[in-house]
């Protein structure tokens, strides 16, 4: 049986969406390793306001959330850098119980669609070196390493 997942655009500026996102993020990031792999700039324990201030305040971003029925199972965000015709993928996360079922791929495809709609040609992302599963996923999706150091690997792909 094929699992049906619905992607919905959500905004941190919408109070209802913010409540939903906050609840999910607090649950997902109760584990410091999960938080570090998703956003190494965050400190543990997870603080929602810090999350918003670091990544979503005054940014030209959109966030897509994966729903399995009424349950939020994942999310992804895109920052548009129009003057460079570039988008930056960040905060791709799927909860542990729903990983490796194609949800990550579907979320990335959604971002690639949005890139085309916004006339953005280059998609970049950062990943921590110890996140081998994410690295493998991004390579499978056609991303190439363009820079790396001990703290992060930067990848890019033409869309």
Where are these regions (language model features)?
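Acetyl-CoA-dependent GNAT
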Residues: 2-90, 95, 108-110, 114, ...
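A short, internal acetyl-CoA/4′-phosphopantetheine-binding micro-motif in the GNAT/acyltransferase core
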Residues: 92-99, 128
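Conserved active-site tyrosine of GNAT-family acetyltransferases
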Residues: 138, 143
């Amino acid at each position: 049986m094929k699992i049906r997942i619905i992607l919905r655009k959500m905004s941190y500026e919408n109070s209802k969406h913010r409540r939903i996102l906050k609840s999910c993020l607090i649950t997902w990031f109760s584990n410091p390793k999960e938080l570090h792999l998703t956003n190494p700039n965050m400190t543990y324990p997870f603080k929602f306001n810090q999350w918003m201030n670091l990544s979503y305040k005054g940014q030209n971003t959109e966030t897509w959330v994966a729903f399995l029925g009424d349950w939020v199972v994942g999310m992804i965000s895109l920052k548009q850098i129009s003057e460079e015709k570039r988008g930056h993928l960040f905060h791709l996360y799927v909860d542990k119980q729903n990983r490796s079922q194609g949800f990550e791929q579907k979320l990335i495809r959604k971002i690639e669609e949005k890139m085309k709609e916004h006339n953005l040609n280059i998609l970049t992302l950062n990943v921590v070196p110890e996140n081998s599963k994410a690295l493998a996923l991004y390579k499978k999706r056609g991303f190439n390493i363009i820079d790396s150091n001990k703290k992060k690997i930067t990848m890019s792909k033409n869309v």
